[in-house]
């Protein structure tokens, strides 16, 4: 008798995706982050759902409802901090996942890569909107500053900003719609994840060598299920440690002050995972130029497949490209640091230098280095 998991209309989809899926035998721990992102998404949706049961999206009561969740709801503090720090873990895994794709040339699967970029934008939008509901000082001013950037769009900018705000400033209407979208977007993200996996399973996984692995495949279960479970344990231990020992480590103290439109915080800055893009935005004195640079800092990933000039897919055997890749990582760390600093000397010039380097490495240095490596291969 044939196993039910191979014949049942629903189970056979699960079976072909997570059990009998042929996977390359050489996958390293860098391939764990896809499943870790799935766990993060699950944790965020569950904790968010329970938080939404006690939260009120009204400017008069929003801040107090979050306080009520932390003080009066059973394990409400745990839900709140799991949700806030879960977002940080989500972005850590997300950036490592994208970095893995860049290093090992996974971007040559263009459909999977482009859906991934859409996912990145969707998750960033979700996280930005999720920063507003606590209705603290940084929630209010962060929303005001970032949405106000859209006013740089010629002709329609001002109308667009007022349309998003639902008035002439960030107020009750803005909070309500941001909360509604913050609730809705994770489900759209889940749908996009399924499309992402669909395209991935059309081609099969890449591997560290970048060489086709068709002759040497192993079943996903039990080999990679066990490997993924180890990843889950490591990540959930890190998340639990963060939540239980220093839940406010990555947050902003200003968000414990209720939103006040008449008092501006000394340093308006987004959450740490947006600081690199914020630094690129601030490094350009022109408003429209800054907004374009901000969008391009992420959208540049879409042209990475076009810029691939190497005869090898992966960077595993390309030491010159490896040096550039790790320089890019250092530049991103520098931008993240600069994004959290005040706009004054010497931070301005450091931020501008790092921003130029970021685009220079991706657009020019990496393709040129790949061509040099191709030439060296002839020797």
Curated annotation (Swiss-Prot):
Heme b b566 binds at residues 97, 196. It is a multi-pass membrane protein. Its cofactor is heme b. A ubiquinone binds at residue 201. The chain crosses the membrane at residues 33-53, 77-98, 113-133, 178-198, 226-246, 288-308, 320-340, 347-367. It is found in: Mitochondrion inner membrane. One of its GO terms (cellular component) is mitochondrial inner membrane. Its main location: mitochondrion. GO terms for molecular function: metal ion binding; ubiquinol-cytochrome-c reductase activity. GO terms for biological process: mitochondrial electron transport, ubiquinol to cytochrome c. The keyword Cell membrane does not apply. Binds 2 heme b groups non-covalently. Keywords: Electron transport, Heme, Iron, Membrane, Metal-binding, Mitochondrion, Mitochondrion inner membrane, Respiratory chain, Transmembrane, Transmembrane helix, Transport, Ubiquinone. PROSITE patterns: CYTB_CTER, CYTB_NTER. Heme b b562 binds at residues 83, 182. Heme 1 (or BL or b562) is low-potential and absorbs at about 562 nm, and heme 2 (or BH or b566) is high-potential and absorbs at about 566 nm. Belongs to the cytochrome b family. The cytochrome bc1 complex contains 11 subunits: 3 respiratory subunits (MT-CYB, CYC1 and UQCRFS1), 2 core proteins (UQCRC1 and UQCRC2) and 6 low-molecular weight proteins (UQCRH/QCR6, UQCRB/QCR7, UQCRQ/QCR8, UQCR10/QCR9, UQCR11/QCR10 and a cleavage product of UQCRFS1). This cytochrome bc1 complex then forms a dimer. Component of the ubiquinol-cytochrome c reductase complex (complex III or cytochrome b-c1 complex) that is part of the mitochondrial respiratory chain. The b-c1 complex mediates electron transfer from ubiquinol to cytochrome c. Contributes to the generation of a proton gradient across the mitochondrial membrane that is then used for ATP synthesis. This is Cytochrome b.
